Amino acid sequence: MNTSQLREKFKEVFGVEADHTFFSPGRINLIGEHTDYNGGNVLPVAITLGTYGAARKRDDKVLRFFSANFEEKGIIEVPLENLRFENEHNWTNYPKGVLHFLQEAGHTIDSGMDIYIYGNIPNGSGLSSSSSLELLIGVIVEKLYDLKLERLDLVKIGKQTENDFIGVNSGIMDQFAIGMGADQCAIYLDTNTLKYDLVPLDLKDNVVVIMNTNKRRELSDSKYNERRAECETAVSELQEKLDIQTLGELDLWTFDAYSYLIKDENRIKRARHAVLENQRTLQARKALEAGELEGFGRLMNASHVSLKYDYEVTGLELDTLAHTAWEQEGVLGARMTGAGFGGCAIALVNKDKVEDFKKAVGQRYEEVVGYAPSFYIAEVTGGSRVLD
């Protein structure tokens, strides 16, 4: 959607002109899964599937929201003084949360807004539609009210909204990738320190294909919080002998030497994934920087195997996509991405083989699962921003 279309749609809905238009990307994580809340490293990119917005300030204290993705909900009106979570306010709880925490941080938001939203991230796909919306609202408010905000502060407010307003116990990777994304770069982020480097993404004759299971995944209803709790318990057991706060602080040798302290086989498996995935992510960064895409692909494959057997977050749909992708000509690697239990997988595919790849994987998936997957080419873009 371009800016003139955004402005036209805004005027259709609200009857006035928008002040500005905005875009906030989605994200995929190339590798480093379920490590962000374990103090480990991640390697995400911001993508051109994302969330568009148009907005204007109002003279009163009323917030009016409209989403083209939920047209049946119509315009949802919220008093600026009432930024509490309410089920009937549906998707607008995300913007309400961002506004609430901006105000709590001392930023002055002294009038209402009209906000039009359109997103082309499939809902429940695991490509971070909620984080994209959170950062979009942050950028809108920053522009309309001329707030002087560090981008990292907006990232943290997005995470705070997810954790403390919506109630999903997620890490910071999604908001960080979306807020800090850069053209044609992956972000190598240490989630323990929030130190990061931009890693140029030269895929040569290859593209990243996103494979959507089309099995909707509700993060707050999934086993995500259970996995996080298992890892936190493993850390507390390891602390009997080790001075650590997160699994991300461990190398494989130390983990192997002290894993006997973890009293449950499942928790050992969860912790082993977190430690090994952290090492794989470091190796993947080095492979990208050296242009060793075959090695990068092998690390993707190993990541999926670990997520299947040690972390147990894949399932029939994601496994079918990844396993079938591995068998195709021109594929360097494939893995699930995101929290799992549905959502999406990604594959690194030679660009000349993409159509054959989609046909073969789609056919096999439909035979096994009973309905078709969807495919998108991941184009890497910059972070959340003002368009005009």
UniProtKB/Swiss-Prot annotation:
The record marks R27 as: Transition state stabilizer. Catalyzes the transfer of the gamma-phosphate of ATP to D-galactose to form alpha-D-galactose-1-phosphate (Gal-1-P). ATP binds at S67, G124, S125, G126, L127, S128, S129, S130. PROSITE patterns: GALACTOKINASE, GHMP_KINASES_ATP. This is Galactokinase. GO terms for molecular function: ATP binding; galactokinase activity; magnesium ion binding. Its EC number is 2.7.1.6. Mg(2+) binds at S130, E162.
